[in-house]
């Protein structure tokens, strides 16, 4: 146990976590030169393409230091704000963390938020200054920033470069010297924390865990404490680049377990594994469920694929503990699910993974957040509104509360004005402004979460020329003037396009929505009115003109009554068509409504 070190890597997006992890694997000869490729641990195609880490990955390395063999368990974590739960999960399984800061970009908002997560869990922090070989690197200034943030000494900061491999030996030495070995007693009853699970179509669910106390043996009967289900440990082992089966995994180590579990619901991340015969009395605490921030409907394009979609979602949920979904139905789209996501990036990723890994083509509706509505009848009782169609009628409504967040934005001093006006346009309230250095400013805003859901992140990057970084944490519900905006096509409400928005923006959004839909819905044989309404009041209207046949073409001689007869006949036909005709909405129309401000 004294020779084990568990650590994770935390950093802002693109500060070089995955590349540095590759170098560590190379230096410890965990991977041969032949297996080496960039972003070795990002094994989803999607992660490679976007160059981001989505899942945390665990891998074991062996390293000789001063003549002794050490076992290092590395857990690579994502840097994006949407995936901070992945980070918190990995942090729970470690004793130390490498805090990586890009020498060119300095400290960003997420560096700080992930650092606080690590400090709350009492991890030993090793600061690493990455990318020092870049011509634009500014190591002296950035070192000062790190010292201000951590209160460490200048000589504690390790200079490194993931690209060239410079400084990797120093990092490994620091991990062994500074990070404490895991605490725990191999003699006590088994107690292990599940921090990840993966679905394997042939072998069922692979559970990835870290043993806190005791040891787990092959063939032992074990129990999951949250569900009280018992299983046999058919195969256990440690994780190198591939799985290495072992007969016993003891306290302090990270390993995997296969016991032929097929049901996704039986494995809960954050659960405790214990021995079925001699169970431990207490569960491992300090692991809370993630709360989804953004809700959207996901529907199969073909209603018959509903069951396939359900099983695909369950398999995704295994690998992604933060995805929540409940069945719902919509008049326009049939049966589907209302899903909760951590943010817009998460929603896009889930949609892409459904398409890639499970061949499901899905329609997503307008994303929204979760509101609380109070009626005049019972002003004390809160109704949870995840779907705009659940909102009570305006006449019965007393008030609506929406979730607010505290946003921290770090930007260059030149862009403060732009960032402020963007936040104020999004109904933000500035609470604090501090200059970290003469160049960098930290702004704090209280903002409604709903305003961030759409395109806030992209627009923030645009107004700050890519320099601003952004992080947020929820601060509770506040009362707001919200209205439900309905879209009517051919006088019928399309429930999938409804949205809850602030009263002041209603007219603008309604107008934009109708204009956008007019461009995207194909013309029919009859006029289609597109209306935006609040309750019974229509606030904007556009009409898609009918395609018409020239019925008078065959009349030569120009007798007006003959022409009129044919035109009247056509008019009657169009009227009848309009009564029975229904309008198909293409998927592009749903997606375009989300991106109204472009």
Curated annotation (Swiss-Prot):
Q: Could you tell me which Gene3D superfamilies the record lists for this protein? A: 3.30.70.240, Elongation factor 4, C-terminal domain, Elongation Factor G (Translational Gtpase), domain 3, P-loop containing nucleotide triphosphate hydrolases, Translation factors
Q: Which GO terms describe its molecular function?
A: GTP binding; GTPase activity; ribosome binding; translation elongation factor activity
Q: How does it sit in the membrane?
A: Peripheral membrane protein
Which reaction does this enzyme catalyse, per its entry?
GTP + H2O = GDP + phosphate + H(+)
What PROSITE patterns does UniProt report for this protein, alphabetically? G_TR_2
Q: Name one GO cellular component term.
A: plasma membrane
Compartments reported by the entry: Cell inner membrane
**Which named protein is this?**
Elongation factor 4
| GN (gene name) | lepA
């Amino acid at each position: 146990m004294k020779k084990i070190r568990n650590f994770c890597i935390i950093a802002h997006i693109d500060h070089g976590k995955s590349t540095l992890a590759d170098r560590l694997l190379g230096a410890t000869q965990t991977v041969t030169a032949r297996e080496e490729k960039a972003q070795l641990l990002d094994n989803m195609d999607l992660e490679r393409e976007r160059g981001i880490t989505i899942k945390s990955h665990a891998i074991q390395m062996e390293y000789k230091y001063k003549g002794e063999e050490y076992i290092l368990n590395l857990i690579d974590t994502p840097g994006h704000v949407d995936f901070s739960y992945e980070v918190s999960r990995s942090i729970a399984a470690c004793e130390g963390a490498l805090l990586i800061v890009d020498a060119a970009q300095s400290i960003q908002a997420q560096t700080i938020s992930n650092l606080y997560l690590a400090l709350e869990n009492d991890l030993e922090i090793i600061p690493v200054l990455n990318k020092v070989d870049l011509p634009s690197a500014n190591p002296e200034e950035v070192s000062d920033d790190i010292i201000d943030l951590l209160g460490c000494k200048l000589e504690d900061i390790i200079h490194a470069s993931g690209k060239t491999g410079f400084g990797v030996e120093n990092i490994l030495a620091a991990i062994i010297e500074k990070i404490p070995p895991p605490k725990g007693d191999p003699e006590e009853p088994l107690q292990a924390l599940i921090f990840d699970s993966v679905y394997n179509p042939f072998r069922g669910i692979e559970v990835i865990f870290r043993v806190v106390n005791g040891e787990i043996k092959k063939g032992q009967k074990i129990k999951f404490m949250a569900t009280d289900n018992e299983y046999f440990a058919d195969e256990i082992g440690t994780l190198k680049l591939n799985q290495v089966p072992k007969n016993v995994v003891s306290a302090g180590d990270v390993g995997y377990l296969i016991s032929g579990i097929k049901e996704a619901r039986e494995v809960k991340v954050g659960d405790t594994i214990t021995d079925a015969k001699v169970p431990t009395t207490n569960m491992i605490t300090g692991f809370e469920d993630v709360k989804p921030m953004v809700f959207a409907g996901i529907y199969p394009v073909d209603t018959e694929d509903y069951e396939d979609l359900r099983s695909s979602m369950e398999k995704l949920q295994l690998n992604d503990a933060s995805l929540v979904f409940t069945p719902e139905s919509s008049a326009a789209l049939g049966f589907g699910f209302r899903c909760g996501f951590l943010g817009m990036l998460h929603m896009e990723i889930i949609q892409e993974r459904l398409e890639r890994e499970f061949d499901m083509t899905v329609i997503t509706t307008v994303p929204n957040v979760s509101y609380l509505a109070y009626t005049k009848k019972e002003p004390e009782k809160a109704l949870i509104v995840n779907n705009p169609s659940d909102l009570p009628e305006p006449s019965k409504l007393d008030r609506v509360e929406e979730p607010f967040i505290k946003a921290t934005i770090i930007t260059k001093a030149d862009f403060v004005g732009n960032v402020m006006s963007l936040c104020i346009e999004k109904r933000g309230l500035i609470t604090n402004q501090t200059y970290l250095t003469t160049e960098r400013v930290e702004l704090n805003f209280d903002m409604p979460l709903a305003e961030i859901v759409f395109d806030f992140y992209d627009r923030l990057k645009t107004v700050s020329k890519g320099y601003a970084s952004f992080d947020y944490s929820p601060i509770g519900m506040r009362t707001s003037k919200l209205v439900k905006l309905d879209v009517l096509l051919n006088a019928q409400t399309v429930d999938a396009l409804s949205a809850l928005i602030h009263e002041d923006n209603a007219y603008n959004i309604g107008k934009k929505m109708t204009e956008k839909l007019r461009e995207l819905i194909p013309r029919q044989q009859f006029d289609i009115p597109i209306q935006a309404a609040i309750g019974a009041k229509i606030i904007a209207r556009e009409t898609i003109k009918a395609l018409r046949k020239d019925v008078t073409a065959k009349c030569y001689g120009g007798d007006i009554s003959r022409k009129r007869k044919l035109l009247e006949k056509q008019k009657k036909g169009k009227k009848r068509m309009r009564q029975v005709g229904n309008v198909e909405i293409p998927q592009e129309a749903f997606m375009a409504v989300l991106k109204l401000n472009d």
